[in-house]
């Protein structure tokens, strides 16, 4: 009984005898608590961060259709969200007008836009792509010579004797 009394007295004063087996769980539990707190703070930081998608590489397709049937590939590229440059220099003017009308309709249906680049070269872009600069189809029609004159001067040149 005196030993129990002495242990209680020493414990009261602050001189308690602690075994190593008792200290080890306290240390490990404090380490576990710190680890848990760190993991919780990391998870809070991760939940606040949002992933920013990398800008996807946009390819610009360049085509030179020969006939009206070739325009289907231009429409497919526009549907897939790819800008298309169309060169109509090697096409008969009447066929070129049909291609231009069809491709403009596709671009309009997809909320895209069209711009004249130079001469008979046009840029068609899907929605979400902005074209900055002068010249579009409205100004193209104003600056172009009438189709009859173009057909006569380009394809049906008459020789004078």
From Swiss-Prot:
It holds the Pfam family SepF. Signal peptide: none annotated. InterPro entries: Cell_div_SepF, Cell_div_SepF/SepF-rel, SepF-like_sf. Keywords: Cell cycle, Cell division, Cytoplasm, Septation. It is found in: Cytoplasm. GO terms for biological process: division septum assembly; FtsZ-dependent cytokinesis. The keyword Cytoplasm applies. One of its GO terms (cellular component) is cytoplasm. Its main location: cytoplasm. Residues 19-47 are annotated as: Disordered. Residues 21-35 have a biased composition (Basic and acidic residues). The keyword Cell division applies. Belongs to the SepF family. Cell division protein that is part of the divisome complex and is recruited early to the Z-ring. Probably stimulates Z-ring formation, perhaps through the cross-linking of FtsZ protofilaments. Its function overlaps with FtsA. Homodimer. Interacts with FtsZ. This is Cell division protein SepF 2. It comes from Desulforamulus reducens (strain ATCC BAA-1160 / DSM 100696 / MI-1).
